[in-house]
Regions:
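GST-like domain detector, emphasizing the conserved glutathione-binding G-site
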Residues: 1-37, 42-109
Length: 109
């Protein structure tokens, strides 16, 4: 699964340096909690790559601190989960790959 993901990696959107810098500033407040081999996580990561987004990923299977953050903040150890922190510092935990992809496409496409 991971090999197929690497071999068929999607091309990203090409933006002007200024536009990409703006997108990077917006994605600095996003974190994707994942398991590396989860097919739904791979789907979310491919959408992130396709949209040329610089989103931090945390492996909730191998990193105990990430797993505890996910459980404490989101209430479930379910992946993928996108942690969204807004300008006011409020945090939303979004589960389900389809919802995550729709959110990212709506905001950054």
């Amino acid at each position: 699964m991971l090999l197929g993901d690497r071999l068929t990696s999607p091309r990203g959107i090409v933006r002007s340096p200024e536009a990409q810098q703006q997108v990077d500033a917006s994605t600095a407040r996003l974190v994707l909690y994942e398991f590396r081999m989860c097919p739904f996580c791979i789907k979310a990561r491919r959408a992130i790559k396709r949209l040329s987004l610089n989103i931090e990923t945390r492996d909730a299977m191998r990193q105990e601190t990430s797993r505890q953050e996910l459980l404490a903040g989101g209430g479930n150890i379910q992946v993928p989960c996108l942690r969204i922190t807004d300008d006011a510092g409020d945090t939303t935990w979004m589960y389900e790959s389809a919802d995550i992809i729709a959110y990212l496409q709506g905001r950054f496409a």
